Amino acid sequence: MAVLVVLLSSLVSSALANEFSILRSPGSVVFRNGNWPIPGDRIPDVAALSMGFSVKEDLSWPGLAVGNLFHRPRATIMVTVKGVDKLALPTGSVISYPLENAVPFSLDSVANSIHSLFSEETPVVLQLAPSEERVYMVGKANSVFEDLSVTLRQLRNRLFQENSVLNSLPLNSLSRNNEVDLLFLSELQVLHDISSLLSRHKHLAKDHSPDLYSLELAGLDELGKRYGEDSEQFRDASRILVDALQKFADDMYSLYGGNAVVELVTVKSFDTSLVRKSRTILETKQENTQSPYNLAYKYNLEYSVVFNLVLWIMTGLALAVIITSYNIWNMDPGYDSIIYRMTNQKIRMD
């Protein structure tokens, strides 16, 4: 029995070891201090609600309170760090919550809401995963971040330029000649370049359309696989990453005038077993729903309403034109009309 309790406690602790942290947030978005766990699949809903968008299912999570509905943040910046359950963040300015059921997630729903509501204003939407060479830029992000390095070769070349982070970061046990170390450092370079490029276009951070940034960093995970989590390289990289994230959060928060939410997700590894696979052994074959009888198109339920409106309005207009034309054609002005008076006067003059 004691062994079972120990196993259950270890499973629960491992399931809640990951963290969801709020690095920066404006006064209009209220995050409460507490130890309330947040499901991994509801993180996009937290981002959507904090920006003032609606979600399909109500979020009964006490960590997010109702803020100022008329003053929403101009940007949401979410950074996902893989390979570590938590980082040594400063406890004073950061609010952290346990993350349960850490399943892979995306902010596509938030991006779609931004596109549908602010399509004419072309907001900045940037989703980037440097280690996978995955990038998604829409709106003004194409012009702002067109010089951003996104492929592994571009990232490597960017690191060896004069103004790269290699010249300012204390590498300690990390090496410039190791591909895994360079991958981690290149992700830090991406963080620096995003804030640097945005600082050249500060007017974009002051418009009325909200912006979205989603970054996924896997360099620390690769370092843990290469050297081990107890290695000096992993510890040095964790400290460097904390400092880089703090600086990145401060820069983005300052560029948006203190009206941005900067969020951090630290996950040891995503639990893909909780995600439904696209193909399973119980998958049924797709049935052909087309009818072989060449039936007519199934119209919308409102078709009869629209048809009757158009029919009777056109009928009324046609009758009005016919009646008006008939009355004008058969109109008798009478002998006292000016037409006849002018005619009689003309006759007398003749």
UniProtKB/Swiss-Prot annotation:
<keyword id="KW-0256">Endoplasmic reticulum</keyword>
<keyword id="KW-0458">Lysosome</keyword>
<dbReference type="GO" id="GO:0016324">
    <property type="term" value="C:apical plasma membrane"/>
</dbReference>
<dbReference type="GO" id="GO:0000421">
    <property type="term" value="C:autophagosome membrane"/>
</dbReference>
<dbReference type="GO" id="GO:0009897">
    <property type="term" value="C:external side of plasma membrane"/>
</dbReference>
<dbReference type="GO" id="GO:0030672">
    <property type="term" value="C:synaptic vesicle membrane"/>
</dbReference>
<dbReference type="GO" id="GO:0048069">
    <property type="term" value="P:eye pigmentation"/>
</dbReference>
<dbReference type="GO" id="GO:0021626">
    <property type="term" value="P:central nervous system maturation"/>
</dbReference>
<dbReference type="GO" id="GO:0021903">
    <property type="term" value="P:rostrocaudal neural tube patterning"/>
</dbReference>
<keyword id="KW-0732">Signal</keyword>
<feature type="site" description="Cleavage; by furin-like protease">
    <location>
        <begin position="276"/>
        <end position="277"/>
    </location>
</feature>
<feature type="transmembrane region" description="Helical">
    <location>
        <begin position="303"/>
        <end position="323"/>
    </location>
</feature>
<dbReference type="GO" id="GO:0030665">
    <property type="term" value="C:clathrin-coated vesicle membrane"/>
</dbReference>
<dbReference type="GO" id="GO:0005789">
    <property type="term" value="C:endoplasmic reticulum membrane"/>
</dbReference>
<dbReference type="GO" id="GO:0005615">
    <property type="term" value="C:extracellular space"/>
</dbReference>
<feature type="site" description="Cleavage; by furin-like protease">
    <location>
        <begin position="278"/>
        <end position="279"/>
    </location>
</feature>
<dbReference type="GO" id="GO:0016471">
    <property type="term" value="C:vacuolar proton-transporting V-type ATPase complex"/>
</dbReference>
<dbReference type="InterPro" id="IPR056780">
    <property type="entry name" value="Renin_r_C"/>
</dbReference>
<dbReference type="GO" id="GO:0060323">
    <property type="term" value="P:head morphogenesis"/>
</dbReference>
<dbReference type="GO" id="GO:0002003">
    <property type="term" value="P:angiotensin maturation"/>
</dbReference>
<dbReference type="InterPro" id="IPR012493">
    <property type="entry name" value="Renin_rcpt"/>
</dbReference>
<feature type="topological domain" description="Extracellular">
    <location>
        <begin position="18"/>
        <end position="302"/>
    </location>
</feature>
<dbReference type="GO" id="GO:0043408">
    <property type="term" value="P:regulation of MAPK cascade"/>
</dbReference>
<keyword id="KW-0966">Cell projection</keyword>
<feature type="short sequence motif" description="Mediates retrograde transport to the ER">
    <location>
        <begin position="346"/>
        <end position="350"/>
    </location>
</feature>
<keyword id="KW-0165">Cleavage on pair of basic residues</keyword>
<dbReference type="GO" id="GO:0010008">
    <property type="term" value="C:endosome membrane"/>
</dbReference>
<dbReference type="GO" id="GO:0090263">
    <property type="term" value="P:positive regulation of canonical Wnt signaling pathway"/>
</dbReference>
<keyword id="KW-0812">Transmembrane</keyword>
<keyword id="KW-0968">Cytoplasmic vesicle</keyword>
<feature type="signal peptide">
    <location>
        <begin position="1"/>
        <end position="17"/>
    </location>
</feature>
<dbReference type="Pfam" id="PF07850">
    <property type="entry name" value="Renin_r"/>
</dbReference>
<dbReference type="GO" id="GO:0030177">
    <property type="term" value="P:positive regulation of Wnt signaling pathway"/>
</dbReference>
<keyword id="KW-0675">Receptor</keyword>
<dbReference type="GO" id="GO:0030424">
    <property type="term" value="C:axon"/>
</dbReference>
<comment type="function">
    <text>Multifunctional protein which functions as a renin, prorenin cellular receptor and is involved in the assembly of the lysosomal proton-transporting V-type ATPase (V-ATPase) and the acidification of the endo-lysosomal system. May mediate renin-dependent cellular responses by activating ERK1 and ERK2. By increasing the catalytic efficiency of renin in AGT/angiotensinogen conversion to angiotensin I, may also play a role in the renin-angiotensin system (RAS).</text>
</comment>
<dbReference type="GO" id="GO:0032591">
    <property type="term" value="C:dendritic spine membrane"/>
</dbReference>
<dbReference type="GO" id="GO:0038023">
    <property type="term" value="F:signaling receptor activity"/>
</dbReference>
<dbReference type="GO" id="GO:0000220">
    <property type="term" value="C:vacuolar proton-transporting V-type ATPase, V0 domain"/>
</dbReference>
<dbReference type="GO" id="GO:0097401">
    <property type="term" value="P:synaptic vesicle lumen acidification"/>
</dbReference>
<dbReference type="GO" id="GO:0007042">
    <property type="term" value="P:lysosomal lumen acidification"/>
</dbReference>
<keyword id="KW-0472">Membrane</keyword>
